[in-house]
């Protein structure tokens, strides 16, 4: 069966953003996405946390986030926390950081760096240990 989702722009006020996500859920949409360009729109991690608690069925996530503006360890921890808050309803759309990074005067990640960051994020999200910056790291609380 085909899945349907909606992208809701994270413009103020966040209460209207939440209303639109709740409306999508009430109409049977399976996914609600939001953007992650931290200078262009409101910060989306806290609003996704609110949506996780104020909805019960719809899957939530970024369309897209990136490991160029969000450190991969922070991104993995944030999504693991959001996934816990939402009872497993988080979905991560992830890219190299084109618009978010260009807007602040930087270049998107190189493909090899993106692949490395994505591998690390996936390992963290699955509770596995990651060797990074000469350290063995793990999100030990991830279920």
Set out the residue ranges of the language-model regions.
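N-terminal beta1-alpha1-beta2 module of alpha/beta enzyme domains
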Residues: 1-63
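Residue-level preference for long, well-ordered alpha-helices that form the structural scaffold
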Residues: 13, 71, 110-114
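Conserved N-terminal glycine/acidic-rich loop preference
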Residues: 17, 30, 69-74, 101-104
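Short, glycine/charged-enriched secondary-structure capping and boundary segments
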Residues: 19-21, 46-49, 74-77, 106-109
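Positions that flank functional sites
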Residues: 39, 66-67, 97-98
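Structural motif corresponding to the early beta-alpha repeats
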Residues: 61-78
